[in-house]
């Protein structure tokens, strides 16, 4: 692991680096009983911004046929891990704070704030979702006390924070997202490999395909689709989604100049919904009836995987990721009551119910406990 990646991994403050299972962009969540009593493989939090070994091999591989079509998705309902505690209000919570960061998490933050204020009506929490890239500077200069991010902080962002405060920011995982590749609901494409996604969106084509994919016919579609140019929708550089997709779907290559950079996650989905020949990427929580999430394969020899809950928990869906709230917490010092209780609320049963309501996946109890421990909020005995 490179020095910069060590800093990124350390910034989560969940477990020591030596406990990481291995560099893997997948969530690596084990499911003893589907979507119930979920725990991490090896009992450890494993998350890295490095590409998987499978993707690294694929980057040097020759182009292969389209990914195998997936089986029909399961209709398994998403439930809250019974080990997640309910929330109990405490005395002494007041004041006002601001949240600046991820657009992907804007709706989640709004629901969390709404639920939190039912317990503490006098509290004021303002939220601004301009992109994950706005969170680190806001935390550094103190204009925000919460920094929602749809990616881990980069090592240079951590370095700037540490240069001012002498310690690293703390990233608290709050929920699980599946970054989806969307097409219009009438598009007949069955599946895509990440190498095909790369050749569609990237001018670098580091995935291994040696030619641009510019029309739907290049992907094997016939009839009216054969000669239709693919219209590209994405996010801007301030977005954590932009960076995550660049790293994990484009093999750290550069976007094509013709990608339409939309101001938010919903704008991407709306753009695709209104453009029959479009393709775009956004969080699964923004899916609507007018678009379809295309099943994705790690490479052309692997089966394509639907963007469904059990495939994220099992680690099979290739673009699963954690969504974080970063806070400025000095080691050994307690968070103030407002920030402390908001974090506790997010990781409680009602907080995780809000996650499900927004179309994201709730944390396993094991992960929620580690997240609480990362900010010195170990669960009380009996919880």
Regions found by a protein language model. Give the residues of each.
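N-terminal acidic, proline/glycine-rich, low-complexity intrinsically disordered segments
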Residues: 2-4, 22-24, 47-49
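Extended interaction regions within the primary functional domain
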Residues: 3, 7, 39, 105
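Short, Lys/Arg-enriched N-terminal segments with co-localized hydrophobic residues
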Residues: 3-20
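N-terminal cationic leader/targeting segments used for protein routing and processing
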Residues: 7, 23-25, 69
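Bacterial N-terminal signal peptides that target proteins for export
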Residues: 19-34
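Bacterial N-terminal signal peptides
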Residues: 32-43
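Flexible loop/hinge segments at secondary-structure junctions
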Residues: 48-383
């Amino acid at each position: 692991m490179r020095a910069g990646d060590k800093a990124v991994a350390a910034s989560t403050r969940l477990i020591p680096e030596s406990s990481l299972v291995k560099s893997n962009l997948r969530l690596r969540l084990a499911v003893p009983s589907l979507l119930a009593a979920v725990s991490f493989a090896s009992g450890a939090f494993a998350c890295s911004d490095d590409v998987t070994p499978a993707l690294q091999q694929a980057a040097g591989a020759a182009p292969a046929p389209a990914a195998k079509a997936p089986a029909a998705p399961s209709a398994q309902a998403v439930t809250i891990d019974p080990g997640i505690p309910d929330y109990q209000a405490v005395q002494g919570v007041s004041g006002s704070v601001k949240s600046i960061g991820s657009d992907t998490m804007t709706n989640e933050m709004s629901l969390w704030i709404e639920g939190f204020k039912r317990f503490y009506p006098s509290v004021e929490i303002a939220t601004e979702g301009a992109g994950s890239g706005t969170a680190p500077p806001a935390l550094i200069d103190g204009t925000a006390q919460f920094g929602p991010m749809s990616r881990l902080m980069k090592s240079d962002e951590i370095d700037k924070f540490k240069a001012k405060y002498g310690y690293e920011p703390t990233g608290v995982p709050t929920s699980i997202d599946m970054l989806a590749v969307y097409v219009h609901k009438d598009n007949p494409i069955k599946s895509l490999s990440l190498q095909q996604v790369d050749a569609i969106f990237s001018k670098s084509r580091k995935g291994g395909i040696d030619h641009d994919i510019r029309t739907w016919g290049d992907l094997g579609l016939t009839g009216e689709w054969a000669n239709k140019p693919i219209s590209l929708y994405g996010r801007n550089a301030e977005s954590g989604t932009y960076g995550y997709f660049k790293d994990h779907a484009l093999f750290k290559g550069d976007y094509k100049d013709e990608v339409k950079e939309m101001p938010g996650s919903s704008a991407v989905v709306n753009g695709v919904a209104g453009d029959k020949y479009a393709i775009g990427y956004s969080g699964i929580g923004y899916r609507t009836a007018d678009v379809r999430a295309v099943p994705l394969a790690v490479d052309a020899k692997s089966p394509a995987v639907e963007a469904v809950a059990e495939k994220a928990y099992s680690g099979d869906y290739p673009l699963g990721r954690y969504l974080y709230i970063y806070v400025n917490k000095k080691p050994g010092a307690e968070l103030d009551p407002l920030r402390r209780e908001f974090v506790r609320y997010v990781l409680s049963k009602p907080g995780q119910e809000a996650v499900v309501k927004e179309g994201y996946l709730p944390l396993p109890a094991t992960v929620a406990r580690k997240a609480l421990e990362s900010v010195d909020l170990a669960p009380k005995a009996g919880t």
